[in-house]
Amino acid sequence: MAGRELSHLQQLEAESIQIIREVAAEFDNPVMLYSIGKDSSVMLHLARKAFYPGKIPFPLLHVDTGWKFKEMIAFRDAQAKKFGFELLTHTNPEGVAQGINPFDHGSAKHTDIMKTQGLKQALNQYGFDAAFGGARRDEEKSRAKERVYSFRDRHHRWDPKNQRPELWRTYNGAVNKGESIRVFPLSNWTELDIWQYIYQENIELVPLYFAAERPVVERGGQLIMADDERMKLEEGETIKHEVVRFRTLGCYPLTAAMHSQADNLEKIIEEMLLTRSSERQGRLIDSDQSASMEQKKRQGYF
């Protein structure tokens, strides 16, 4: 009797679960990076499936810059309580002591100190030798050339010219002492795949992904949400209430919203079928300088 043919989403799911299980078996101290966004939510769902009915055998790590949306932090804590996974959080204490913030220090310095350096501190503190991330190849050109097993040196730096071939989905996890890998189980997924899988599996998401009336400021052609009293208005700016949603999430002063009426999953998927723009157009950190994402990754970014 012929086996049942898997659908496109089932094939992606099976591939991701196999990668997660392989890393859990092969590495001594893996961790899953949890940014609280839609891709992290899908990756968490896949990890739960991979080890069901047991618990996820590694912790989740959130590098908290102190500038995430309030709804993201509330959602993070609710998910940890609901599913009972081990949640680690880390904030760069040196950055906090220096008062680093995206308004006074700019996106490049804020991202480097609070995200990149904060991540490296946490990885060193706990001695993780493999870190799962939710990046996808369709997101951005530097991520398009990254391997599923992305090797990092003892300083967590990425050298795109010094990576291993992954023929026939065979992964080489051998690392020298002090080295590590970043693992991307969602590498072959697209943004549309993610949304269709969320719909199929009924995965919970931060409400910010759905259209609602929110307080925003128009700055440089982008809509920035005034999430708390720390929002610094520039001359001539006023806060307006408009119906918007977020296609991608990060630190609130560095993440732009978009006008949208998509307040449920069906409408978001319909919107995705029609859009021709990149989901990362709302991430202000990507416009710091030419090839900024690749430079950040070379320095140890997610």
UniProtKB/Swiss-Prot annotation:
MF GO annotations: ATP binding; sulfate adenylyltransferase (ATP) activity
One BP annotation, GO: hydrogen sulfide biosynthetic process
One family name in Pfam for this protein: PAPS_reduct
Keywords: ATP-binding, Nucleotide-binding, Nucleotidyltransferase, Transferase
Protein name: Sulfate adenylyltransferase subunit 2
SUPFAM superfamilies referenced in this protein's UniProt entry, alphabetically: Adenine nucleotide alpha hydrolases-like
Keyword Nucleotide-binding among UniProt keywords: yes
Gene3D superfamilies on file: HUPs
Keyword Nucleotide-binding in record: yes
Family named by the database record: Belongs to the PAPS reductase family. CysD subfamily.
Pathway membership, UniProt: Sulfur metabolism; hydrogen sulfide biosynthesis; sulfite from sulfate: step 1/3
